[in-house]
Structures are given as structure tokens and as C-alpha cells.
Amino acid sequence: MAVMEMACPGAPGSAVGQQKELPKAKEKTPPLGKKQSSVYKLEAVEKSPVFCGKWEILNDVITKGTAKEGSEAGPAAISIIAQAECENSQEFSPTFSERIFIAGSKQYSQSESLDQIPNNVAHATEGKMARVCWKGKRRSKARKKRKKKSSKSLAHAGVALAKPLPRTPEQESCTIPVQEDESPLGAPYVRNTPQFTKPLKEPGLGQLCFKQLGEGLRPALPRSELHKLISPLQCLNHVWKLHHPQDGGPLPLPTHPFPYSRLPHPFPFHPLQPWKPHPLESFLGKLACVDSQKPLPDPHLSKLACVDSPKPLPGPHLEPSCLSRGAHEKFSVEEYLVHALQGSVSSGQAHSLTSLAKTWAARGSRSREPSPKTEDNEGVLLTEKLKPVDYEYREEVHWATHQLRLGRGSFGEVHRMEDKQTGFQCAVKKVRLEVFRAEELMACAGLTSPRIVPLYGAVREGPWVNIFMELLEGGSLGQLVKEQGCLPEDRALYYLGQALEGLEYLHSRRILHGDVKADNVLLSSDGSHAALCDFGHAVCLQPDGLGKSLLTGDYIPGTETHMAPEVVLGRSCDAKVDVWSSCCMMLHMLNGCHPWTQFFRGPLCLKIASEPPPVREIPPSCAPLTAQAIQEGLRKEPIHRVSAAELGGKVNRALQQVGGLKSPWRGEYKEPRHPPPNQANYHQTLHAQPRELSPRAPGPRPAEETTGRAPKLQPPLPPEPPEPNKSPPLTLSKEESGMWEPLPLSSLEPAPARNPSSPERKATVPEQELQQLEIELFLNSLSQPFSLEEQEQILSCLSIDSLSLSDDSEKNPSKASQSSRDTLSSGVHSWSSQAEARSSSWNMVLARGRPTDTPSYFNGVKVQIQSLNGEHLHIREFHRVKVGDIATGISSQIPAAAFSLVTKDGQPVRYDMEVPDSGIDLQCTLAPDGSFAWSWRVKHGQLENRP
């Protein structure tokens, strides 16, 4: 066995090598002590020299080795033990020939003093060799025999070194943990494992075993470069020490030790949890609050030092400086998905689209800000027939709309679109971001029922959300009713049955449509297929089945004429709401007009809550099973109302009773059905009962009054003369009219009467109606979710005759606009059919002065437009709406093919001018093709700008 010396490259005089040490052996050695010389003599006697002549130096190398005691003046060196493999072949196999190298840092570990240099020289005083980290593969018998003889001679002579060395083996005092292994790769090749910066003061086996993670992590001097050489955990501890020198404690300690023979993984801890709103940031990156922009330490750092402990242990816990966010807030996979989807358009799955739609709804529900200048483009397409290009899908670039508009509603309009790359055509619904609801996509995304219009994807482009869906060439069921007047019983049952199939499919997935009506049922090109669409009012029900209230302070679902009583009363709602609405749709198909409108005017919400269900509007010619099915679906209490599946079975049996579907797809026009006089008199008598409280009112007076008033609510019949001429006008004294003088409502203008010969009645009948409404509202106040002041506010809004829409006004919107009449058109740039206008107006009425998603008296801008025939349109629109958009929205109410808007004094206005918050007063002007007076116009519903 020989001991060789290898110089350290980092120390001075590093050129010392083995060849330089050998000649030094020829020099005269100092006299040895008594014990040392005796050992030398014993070895010389027992073994004869092997080499002679100039190679005698090798005898000393083999027998004594070359290890020397280091001196302060000599060069710094690391001594290693080398031993021959066999006697014949003098090969040296060093026990440790590699320096400590830390992977990833490209640096050798540097010790601070020579005392930390590992020295594996055996301690002669202990009479045994230090444990070897590497064992040779071959052990010859001669080696074992020589080792045995050497140990015996040492024990017999009691040899000891002149200068005692440390009693602890150098492997144990080494600052670098040495891993014992039976494999030849047992050299301590460290992979970013925690390193000590100073040697342990009292080395022992317990420190080798790493019983406590973080033991010895006490840096004497702050060294900012340590993060390159140690693990991230120690780096965090080091940074903490630099900023908090007064806290000398280490990071929290683990509760379970681990064996020293297995070095710990750099991160055997809990998963790192990022901070909102940057889910994909790195662990040591932007840990800062969004609002304060201050460094935000991670509150989960205490968990980094806990291997299995569920609670943070004592130590330098880092408290968050932003208390607005929860300390234990965790990110879900959905949030990471949304972060990856934002800012691009891609083809994906339905769940990706719904996750992204939530961010759109949240952005639109914030306080209204100026429209973004940049046209952001992001979304998910669910079909391969719509292909994004370079992660974009923009209008007029990748797809284009056709000139003809398929339909429009209170929140948007529907066009036919075509993909420029594939040529695929479908329908696109354009919705403003401010009124977009995520439920519109969450409810229908991924549905596969043939009774639900398939969704092809949605893309947000600036302030607009474009929803792509299947194109059904047959139009809507509401358009068919307008074209046909009213539908035959068999065809109405046929479409109702298909709509109930779609509702049954939705209800099985706990989805409430919320706005079932004829306008939201689309038909195929041959009229044989019907499917539900427009999930703008859809609600996802809770799995417990308890339902939820749909009526809130700033949102009213559905259409007023199809609204269920529990919705009006603000009670808990479930899937039975859609059943009520479907039966109201059935009455619309059979009668050609919406329910309730033939008997009542004004705020129908109070009538729906107080009056019996509209079963009297069932045509007498209907089959018994048809009438029974409608009655079962119009039960006022939801618990007594049938489900969609049960009603579907009744409708199918009723269709079989009438002989199945036999009527043609598009037959002859039929006049809408009007209620018989006795039913009208009955309803109006109930409505006029408070007049009997007057002592001057004779007994038959209410009957006469209702006789004269009933035809007023009926659409005019051309073959017959006006009904009011058949009855004498109603005269009321001033005292009698003064008795019904509600102070909050006295300034309201009455609706114009049809009979010009009764001027007094023109003023007294609306007062009577308002008085009756006020009494009913007070009686129902316990069931209404409104305070007394809010009820008076509702009455003051509802009393405006904007809601008095007769059936003939539905057919001709221009007739509905009378002098000084406020249409309350709302939604997206006044896009509203008459049915939708009723729904949106009801939505505004119950807004109660709070910020709403639709413009109202309280949060919209006022726009007054004088039509070509002198009528005034009073419109409430969104803030920052443009004049051109308003003109496009009212194009159906202007009796001209092409028109433009100017100020009251005739000055032109730009089509892109935003309406100021104070409002604007405009008037219509003709814009024919041959005129050069207009710079822009609206022709056939399309905005044109003169180049």
C-alpha cells in the first residue's frame, strides 16, 4: 500500500506532483523515535527488499508510503491512499481520486480553510484503517495476507504517531456528505444537494445522518453567490438571512428524519402554489401584489421545509402584505387553462370555451369604461369547418356576414356568415360584451340533443362576442306565427312536443332555459324540425333541487308575457318555470298573440302574480286533451305543475287525438283569435270593481264602463265598426274623479283614447287603472321583494304607457310609436322586436335604480328622435353608443327605405359620433340615392357611408 500526494489546484504551489515527491525520499531523513524505528526494523527483517539499485526508492514507497505531515510553509495538498492490486503487477488504485464537483454549477466546492480538506489517511493510533468509500472488484490472497501481517506487527509494537491526528475519521469530519455504496460509482457526485458553509463544531454520526433538514444552515458571512451552489430551499433561507440579519434561526425543521445514505431530493415538499393573478409565473418570479406592486412573500414558504407535516412549523414565516387575497388561495386547473387560452383563437373542446366565457362575462360586468382601442381576438371554435388562421378569427378577414339579417333581439342580432377558408356557412349572433352572460355558452356548449341548436364556438373581437351556431333555414317559430296569423292545432302541438323534448334534455342536466317562447324556437327549411336556441337567460340549477331565485335587483329573466308567477314574486324557481313558458307559447301559437295582452294593459307582472292563470284564453275549438295539457302546465303553484317530460306525454296523446300532423307547412293566413265579449267583460269587470266604492256610481255603471273599455284593448277588426260607438260614453264628475287622485302618480299622461267624443274618460280611466294597480301592489307587498319606496318607484315607471302594446302594434311597429310615446327600446342599439321590447322594458322597470345590464331610466342616456311623420321616439341607450348604431336599430320603425339623422336645426351629425351622457335630440331626414345632402344613411337596415 502506498500513499500518494496530490496538490490542490487552488492552493499556492500547486505544481507539486508525484514525480517531484519521489526524489525527496533520497534526502537524509531525521532520526526516528524509538517506537518508530522498531517498527521499521521489524518490517525490514520480515520482508527482504524487492527492488535494488536506483529503484530502491520503491521499496520505501511499498512498505512505508509517501504520506507526510503537512506544514504551514509547504504547499496545500490532499493526501490519498494508493495500494497495489497484486505483487506482480504494481498498479495503484486510489481510493478517492475525484474532487468534489457540484452538478449544475460548473464549479468545484471551495473550502474556507485547510482544516476542511478531506484527509483519508489512517489513524495509526486506532490500529485500523478508515472506512473506504470505494471497494475494489478484486481482492488477492497476497493482499489479505500482507494486511494481516501488518496489523499483527502494529499491535505487537504499539506503534503510534509522534503527532496525534484528530480522533474522528476524516470521512465524518468532511463538510461534504459522503454516500457509501457498493457500486464503483460511489464517489460523492453531488446534484444540487444542500451544502454546509462551515464545518460542524462537534462532528458526530448524528450530523452525518441528516436527522433534521436544515441542520448547520448557519452561514457565517452573507454570500450572495450561494444561490448558485446550493438548493433553492437554502437559497431562500440565505436571502431571508440577508434581509433579516436579526433572525438567526434556520428554516422550519421537518418532523421525520431520513437516512443519511440517501440524499434528499431538492424539492420533496408540497406543490408550489402560485399567486393570483399570474398562475404561470415562476416560483421566484413576480411575487407581488397587483395593486400595491410590493414584494409579496409566498405564505406557503413555511410548507417548503415540511416533508410530511400538514401544518407550518415555527420559523421565519413570511406573512403576505396584501391582505385582500386569501392566504390559502389555490389555483385550479381551469384557471391555468384560461391563462393559456387568452389572447388567441384555437380549435378546442366545449369546456375550454365555457372557461373562457366566464372571463368575458366578468369583464363585461365591471363598471363601464371606454371601449378598448385594441381589437382583442380570443375564443374557441368547436368545429373543424371554422378554421382560425394564425390564432385569429376576425370578421371581414377570416369570415364575413351576408347582407340579410336573420333576426334581432334585445341583446343582439343574428346574421348568416361564411368562413372564407372552408366556405362553410352558419349563423352568428353578435352580442355586446356589456350584456353578455356566460350562461349562454355554458348551458348549450357540448349538448348533443337534436332539439337544441348546436353551438360551433364563440370568439370575442374587441367589445363584441360572436357566437357561432347551426343555421336553420326555416326561421323562427315566432316569424311563422306572424306570417300565418295563428297556427292550426295539430302543428302547434307538433312544435310544442319537440320543444318539450329539448326542455326535458336540458332539465335532466339541471339547466333552466329561462326564456322559452316562439322567437327562441328555430325551424328547419321544411318545417319538420324544431330546436331551442338563445340561452341568454339560461340558469344552471343546483344539484340539491331546491331551486334559486331568478329575480334580482338588476336582472329580470325571460319575457314578461311568458313569465311564471314564481319568477314575478321573487320566489325560488326550478325547471317548472320553462313548463309555464312553453304553455304560454302554445297560447301564442293558437291565438296569434301573446297571453295576457288581450285582457290587460300596463304592467302585466302584477296581473300574473294576482290573477288566475290564463286558461280562459284556450280556444274553445281545441280538443279536450289539448286543453287539459295546457291547464296542467299553467298551474299557478309549481308543486302542482307537471314536468316537461309529463307534459310532453300529454301533448303527444293530444296530437294523436287530433289525427296527427296533417296541416301544411305554410298554409293560408288566418286572423288572430280575439276573446269573446263575455270573457272580456268578465275580466274588465274584475278590473273595475273598486269603482263600486263610489256612492254616486250606480249599479250597472261598472258594466257599462267595461263594455266601453273592452273593445279598446282588442285589435281593430276591419269588417266591423269601432266598438266604442255602440255604447254611451262614460261621464264622471269632478268630485268623483278627484277621489282617486294618487299624489305620486297625478302627473302621468294618460294614453290616448280611441273615441275622441269622450274627453273626460280619457283622463279618468287611466287614473282608475293606476289606483287599482296601487291597491293590488299594496295587497301583494308581502310577497314582493320590494320596499314601499321601491314599489312607488316601480309604479311611476310602469305607469308610462310605453308598455301598452296592442297586437296590431306588434304587426306594424311604426303604429306603436305615437306622439310623445317612450318606446323604452333597449338592448343593443335599440334592436328589439315588440315581444323583446316588452321583455326588456320589464327588465328595466324592476332595476330599482341600480346599475343594470340593460339601459333604463336610471342608467341609460336619453335619445329623442323625431320620425318622418312627426312622431317622437324616446329611447334609452347605453353610454358611448354611436348615432349610426341607433339609426340601424330603429330602421324598422321608420317608414322609409333610406334615411339619415340630423340635429333639430338640420345640422348633420357623424354616424360614429358618441351620444353624450346628457342625451341628444335628433330627427330623421330622407336620404335617396340621387341626393347629395347626406354623408351617411341607413338603407334597408344597413349602414352606408358615402365615400
Swiss-Prot record:
Effect on the protein upon substituting V345M: In IMD112; uncertain significance; decreased phosphorylation of CHUK/IKKA
Q: Where is the active site?
A: D515
GO molecular function terms noted in the UniProt entry? ATP binding; MAP kinase kinase kinase activity; protein kinase activity; protein serine kinase activity; protein serine/threonine kinase activity
Using the record's annotations, give every residue carrying the modification Phosphothreonine: T559
Region called Interaction with ZFP91, residue ranges: 401-653
Feature: compositional bias, Basic and acidic residues: 665-674
**Chain sites annotated for binding ATP:** L406, G407, R408, G409, S410, F411, G412, E413, V414, K429
Tissue-by-tissue expression: Weakly expressed in testis, small intestine, spleen, thymus, peripheral blood leukocytes, prostate, ovary and colon.
The reaction(s) this protein catalyses: L-seryl-[protein] + ATP = O-phospho-L-seryl-[protein] + ADP + H(+); L-threonyl-[protein] + ATP = O-phospho-L-threonyl-[protein] + ADP + H(+)
List keywords of the entry alphabetically.
Answer: ATP-binding, Cytoplasm, Disease variant, Kinase, Nucleotide-binding, Phosphoprotein, Serine/threonine-protein kinase, Transferase, Ubl conjugation
Biased composition, Low complexity: where in the chain? 741-752
Q: Which disease is it linked to?
A: Immunodeficiency 112: An autosomal recessive, primary immunologic disorder characterized by variable abnormalities affecting lymphoid immunity, including hypogammaglobulinemia, lymphopenia or paradoxical lymphocytosis, and recurrent bacterial, viral, and fungal infections.
List the protein's name: Mitogen-activated protein kinase kinase kinase 14
Q: Where is it chiefly localized?
A: cytoplasm
Upon changing T852I, the result is: In an ovarian mucinous carcinoma sample; somatic mutation
Which Enzyme Commission number(s) are listed? Answer: 2.7.11.25
Q: Where in the cell is it found?
A: Cytoplasm
In this chain, composition skew of type Polar residues spans: 814-829
- Sequence ranges assigned to domain Protein kinase in this UniProt record: 400-655
UniProt family annotation: Belongs to the protein kinase superfamily. STE Ser/Thr protein kinase family. MAP kinase kinase kinase subfamily.
What species is given as this protein's source?
A: Homo sapiens (Human)
| InterPro entries for the chain | Kinase-like_dom_sf, M3K14_STKc, MAP_kinase_kinase_kinase, MAPKKK14, Prot_kinase_dom, Protein_kinase_ATP_BS, Ser/Thr_kinase_AS
